[in-house]
């Protein structure tokens, strides 16, 4: 996968000098034990690194400043072991520019009624400290995440893990660079958007390139490189020659291999991690990139068709958030309206992400009725089953809006022998009529990113971090 580099999270435990050094030593020991256990749980996707105790304003401010300038630190998790006066937290929290999670827990799971005394109460007063700390975060409008529950429980650790994925994606959002090969598809409305506002609000850089810039890279690819990649295809996919001669079929597939090499090289040379194409901008190209795009999406590059840079950036963002698991660009195509079977067929003219495949993809070559080019190669497969979210972002002139619809995907049961593209099927929540109606009334686009790994809660967490209006349909 196209990686984001090593990331870690800092664990900052709140207390104060009031309780004396003996108590603080116990706080440190408990904090270290928690850190070690959480790291050893195999639930958290990124390591947790314990910091000095947060016992005064200067220490807290120093920690938060360091978090900001250290790129490997993706966010902060705080825990109030004792009461920690919140005025100490104001400046550091205001300065913090990375995601913050308040873990409302305590070291011990139960109250030891036979032995509890005031020493125990002074040491273990997270309920007291949580409310003081929670107030100042709310007062500062910090949009921090709050996770509540005993820290050893799997469901609590899972919530922390899911937030970590969001925090890493939030940081990566400011590194998203989209290369647009050609412009938007003519006359399409929802793919347009304010690139300046997107860079201000989300951190996305969007650059245009004429298709000739890519053609130069394609022409520089060698036969040796193409043949080596073609051999890799043979190991990974089924070859379906259809009605083509083997020679013509391989020739078509090798065109896509040259595109994969060229596009990846172009993106990597420019520091881009997402891209768009447009079937209306293919001067100098033999085919519309299909198999090439699918392969690059599988490697973690964001993509959307018809110049839709917003969805390409969103695709990259959610691929980082999901660690590139069961997440990809999608387009609504056809309704199934039979009573009791209402669902929506998802696909695209070529570029369906193989991270959504339930079976071994096969490479086929088939005509494409648009673009006026040679028959392109593409991967064909059936989509996997699972619950997830489908997400769309649109520019409404005054603001961006994120639509989040919960869906249940299912594997197709009826063959489609004449369909030359991959297919994904899902039912929308809460039901077909209300789900589709809400999507349309709120201006949801036909280009989306679907994830069978991520949750609605994660989408909301990200939206709050970037002050993005959102609508949930579930």
UniProtKB/Swiss-Prot annotation:
EC assignment: 5.3.1.4
Reported cofactor(s): Mn(2+)
GO molecular function, one term: manganese ion binding
InterPro entries reported for this sequence: Ara_Isoase_C (IPR024664), AraA_central (IPR055390), AraA_N (IPR055389), AraA_N_sf (IPR038583), Fuc/Ara_isomerase_C (IPR004216), Fucose_isomerase_N/cen_sf (IPR009015), Lara_isomerase (IPR003762)
One Gene Ontology cellular component annotation held by this UniProt entry: cytosol
One Pfam family hit: Arabinose_Iso_C
Cofactor binding comment, as recorded: Binds 1 Mn(2+) ion per subunit.
Reactions it catalyzes: beta-L-arabinopyranose = L-ribulose
Pathway: Carbohydrate degradation; L-arabinose degradation via L-ribulose; D-xylulose 5-phosphate from L-arabinose (bacterial route): step 1/3
Keywords per UniProt: Arabinose catabolism, Carbohydrate metabolism, Isomerase, Manganese, Metal-binding
PANTHER family registered for this protein in UniProt: L-ARABINOSE ISOMERASE
The protein's role, per its UniProt record: Catalyzes the conversion of L-arabinose to L-ribulose.
Family, as annotated: Belongs to the arabinose isomerase family.
Name of the protein: L-arabinose isomerase 2
Species this chain originates from: Bacillus licheniformis (strain ATCC 14580 / DSM 13 / JCM 2505 / CCUG 7422 / NBRC 12200 / NCIMB 9375 / NCTC 10341 / NRRL NRS-1264 / Gibson 46)
């Amino acid at each position: 996968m196209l990686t984001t580099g090593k990331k870690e999270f800092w664990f900052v435990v709140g207390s104060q000098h009031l309780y004396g050094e003996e108590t603080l030593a116990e706080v440190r020991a408990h904090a270290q034990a928690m850190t070690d256990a959480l790291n050893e749980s195999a639930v958290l996707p990124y390591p947790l690194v314990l910091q000095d105790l947060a016992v005064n304003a200067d220490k807290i401010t120093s920690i938060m400043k360091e978090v900001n300038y250290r790129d490997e630190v993706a966010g902060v998790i705080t825990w109030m072991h004792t009461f920690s006066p919140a005025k100490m937290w104001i400046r550091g929290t205001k300065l913090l520019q990375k995601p913050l999670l308040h873990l409302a827990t305590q070291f011990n799971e139960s109250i030891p009624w036979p032995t509890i005394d005031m020493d125990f109460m002074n040491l273990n007063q997270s309920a007291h400290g949580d409310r003081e700390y929670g107030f100042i975060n709310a007062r500062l409008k910090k949009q921090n995440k709050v996770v509540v529950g005993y820290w050893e429980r799997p469901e609590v650790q899972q919530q922390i893990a899911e937030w970590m994925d969001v925090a890493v994606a939030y940081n990566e959002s400011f590194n998203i660079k989209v290369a647009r090969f050609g412009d938007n598809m003519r006359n399409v409305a929802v793919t347009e958007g304010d690139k300046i506002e997107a860079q201000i609000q989300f951190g996305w850089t969007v650059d245009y390139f004429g298709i000739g810039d890519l053609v130069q890279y394609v022409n520089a690819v060698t036969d040796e490189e193409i043949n080596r990649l073609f051999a890799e295809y043979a190991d990974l996919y089924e070859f379906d020659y259809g009605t083509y001669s083997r020679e013509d079929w391989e020739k078509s597939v090798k065109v896509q291999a040259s595109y994969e090499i060229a596009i990846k090289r172009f993106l990597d040379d420019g520091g881009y991690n997402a891209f768009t194409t447009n079937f209306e901008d293919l001067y100098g190209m033999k085919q519309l990139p299909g198999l090439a795009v699918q392969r690059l999406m599988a490697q973690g590059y964001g993509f959307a068709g018809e110049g839709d840079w917003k969805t390409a950036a969103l695709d990259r963002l959610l691929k980082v958030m999901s660690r590139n698991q069961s997440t990809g660009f999608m387009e609504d195509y056809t309704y199934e309206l039979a009573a009791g079977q209402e669902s929506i067929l998802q696909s695209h003219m070529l570029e369906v992400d193989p991270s959504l495949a339930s079976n071994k993809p096969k490479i086929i070559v088939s005509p494409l009725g648009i673009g006026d080019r040679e028959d392109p190669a593409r991967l064909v497969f059936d989509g996997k089953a699972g619950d997830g979210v489908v997400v769309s972002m649109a520019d409404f002139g005054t603001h961006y809006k994120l639509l989040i619809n919960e869906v249940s995907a299912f594997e197709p049961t009826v063959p489609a022998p004449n369909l030359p593209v991959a297919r994904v099927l899902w039912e929308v929540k809460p039901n077909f009529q209300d789900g589709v109606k809400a999507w349309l009334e709120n201006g949801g686009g036909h280009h989306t990113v679907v994830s069978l790994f991520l949750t609605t809660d994660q989408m909301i967490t990200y939206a709050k971090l970037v002050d993005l209006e959102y609508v949930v349909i579930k």
